[in-house]
Amino acid sequence: MILACDVGLKRIGIAALLNGVILPLEAILRHNRNQASRDLSDLLRKKDIQVLVVGKPNESYADTHARIEHFIKLVDFKGEIVFINEDNSSVEAYENLEHLGKKNKRIATKDGRLDSLSACRILERYCQQVLKKG
């Protein structure tokens, strides 16, 4: 199974590819990086993930780039890790919340649903770029 994550300072959005369908999963709320990396490691183990797709911004965001790489090194995972450009994935995900009112959009942003929809976009890009080549 393939899992994607959108690593943020407060939440980690999660999406999975199941039988060819991309599904958002419950986001990991991040209290500190050790707890978050442990939670992600546990999820990867429980779901028997073979490939972890990680969203990363372009090189001009050096601090974020380094922070994401450092976080992923804390994750206990022996499978394949693939980094995919995440630029605008959160903007695209936010557009998917158009049907929600202002208050519900705010709630979706805070509870991690937006982050997991962003992880869906990252997983879509992986499927388009990597799986289509095979």
UniProtKB/Swiss-Prot annotation:
It is found in: Cytoplasm. One of its GO terms (biological process) is rRNA 5'-end processing. The keyword Hydrolase applies. Keywords: Cytoplasm, Hydrolase, Nuclease, Ribosome biogenesis. GO terms for molecular function: nuclease activity. One of its GO terms (cellular component) is cytosol. Its main location: cytoplasm. The keyword Nuclease applies. Its EC number is 3.1.-.-. It comes from the Bacteria. InterPro entries: RNaseH-like_sf (IPR012337), YqgF (IPR005227), YqgF/RNaseH-like_dom (IPR006641), YqgF/RNaseH-like_dom_sf (IPR037027). Belongs to the YqgF nuclease family. Could be a nuclease involved in processing of the 5'-end of pre-16S rRNA. HAMAP family: Nuclease_YqgF (MF_00651). NCBIfam families: PRK00109.2-2. This is Putative pre-16S rRNA nuclease. It comes from Helicobacter pylori (strain J99 / ATCC 700824) (Campylobacter pylori J99).
